[in-house]
Amino acid sequence: MSTLVSLPGATPVAAPDYQSLERPLNFTESAAAKVKSLIQEEGNLDLALRVYIEGGGCSGFQYGFEFDENRAEDDLAVQTSGVTLLVDPLSLQYLMGAEVDYTESLTGAQFVIRNPNAKTTCGCGSSFSM
């Protein structure tokens, strides 16, 4: 069963039936390890990393990350190494098949989303277009 949903300014699309997929989103070991470290620093083991999409950025949509204690009934929850990644259904339709990773390089360390649905991305990698 699918529902039509969209972000402001975007064409409505059928929301994916993520329950029928084994792993609609990949949450890497590297990302899970970093999230686990940050959660331990916060001292709140009930926290999960929420990834979401919102309008904005130089390419039209942008990724957002925040810690969240509350899981909605229709959130997708992906577990890796005991750490939970949450995604709401609206954001999930733009993130199906994506990978959430954490990378460290000479230029810095950051969470990275490799999104096969993005047609273009900006230079910093935090915004994209569909």
Swiss-Prot record:
Keywords: Iron, Iron-sulfur, Metal-binding. Its cofactor is iron-sulfur cluster. Iron-sulfur cluster binds at residues 58, 122, 124. Pfam families: Fe-S_biosyn. The keyword Methyltransferase does not apply. GO terms for cellular component: cytosol. The keyword Transport does not apply. GO terms for biological process: iron-sulfur cluster assembly. It comes from the Bacteria. One of its GO terms (molecular function) is 2 iron, 2 sulfur cluster binding. Homodimer. Required for insertion of 4Fe-4S clusters for at least IspG. This is Iron-sulfur cluster insertion protein ErpA. It comes from Stenotrophomonas maltophilia (strain R551-3).
